[in-house]
Amino acid sequence: SYQSRGCKVYCFHHGNDASFSKNEFGHQLSTSHCKNFIVPTKGIAKRYSRDYSSLHLEKRVGTEYININSNYMYSMFTKNMYHSNSLKNIERIVIMGYPAHTYRYSCEGGMFFYHKSDLEYRLIKFIKSLGVNVCYKAHPDTLESTKGLYEGIVDEIVVKNFEDSWKATDLLLFTYTSSSTFGYALTTNLPIVLVDPSLELRDREDVILMQKRVNFIKAKVNKIGRVIFNKEELASSILSVNIKQNFEYVQEIYGVSV
């Protein structure tokens, strides 16, 4: 309303997202109507423009992605590198939980709580069969309902903020990337595993960079929405302790331009 009356209106980036999960539908609902959209870094502005500026609504509105050249996330990355990480064996894994609500998202495969809960349960059982402790980082939006799902199945349900709890684990396991937690996790020096049924939806050049930092596990969504993952690849990623300390992607999206 203010924008249509000629007022200069600024909208703000959610945080830690660099469009690794392209979300054209959600983006058009929440962002494309904004003329001035503030993002923290040049790398993020570049990717938002790449993925969304060709949308009809953005062409009509003239959406501009404005980089404020923030060094906040890069300073976190620099600080997190001081964390001692000389792993020989993976003893404790944290699975990043999906919110147990009724929303469906189209930006990645299997983005519905029923399918995610089914996947998370199978991952927990399989990883525990390898002799590794499994903790579950509950999504804060649906904390109480999640507790009832996983109590007695995992070794611990983590309720503290990720930023305050990541140092207490050996490996981080994600089943989706459209989360501010994933963006922060990239700035740590912990090994990261991603069970990813959405490879074909991602930008090829970003995937090449991300594969230098993250261990991708092949997965697909079958006809009934179940995510099928490669157990051998997952076991190898856990037991071989492949940390992947290449941070080109982090430097690309969070680095400050001079």
Predicted regions and their residues:
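Structural alpha-helical scaffold elements that stabilize or flank donor/cofactor-binding regions
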Residues: 29-30, 86, 165-167
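Donor nucleotide-activated moiety binding/catalytic core segment of transferases
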Residues: 121, 132-188, 198
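Short, charged/polar "capping" segments at the starts of alpha-helices
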Residues: 19-20, 44-50, 75-77, 103, ...
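Structural motif
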Residues: 36, 92, 170-173
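Active-site and donor-binding regions of nucleotide-sugar-utilizing enzymes
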Residues: 1-67
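Short, acidic/turn-prone active-site loops that include or flank metal/cofactor-
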Residues: 14-17, 42-43, 70-73, 161-164, ...
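Catalytic binding pocket for nucleotide-activated donors in carbohydrate/polymer assembly enzymes
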Residues: 59-67, 147-154, 176-257
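Conserved catalytic-core segment of nucleotide-activated headgroup transferases in glycan assembly
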Residues: 66-148
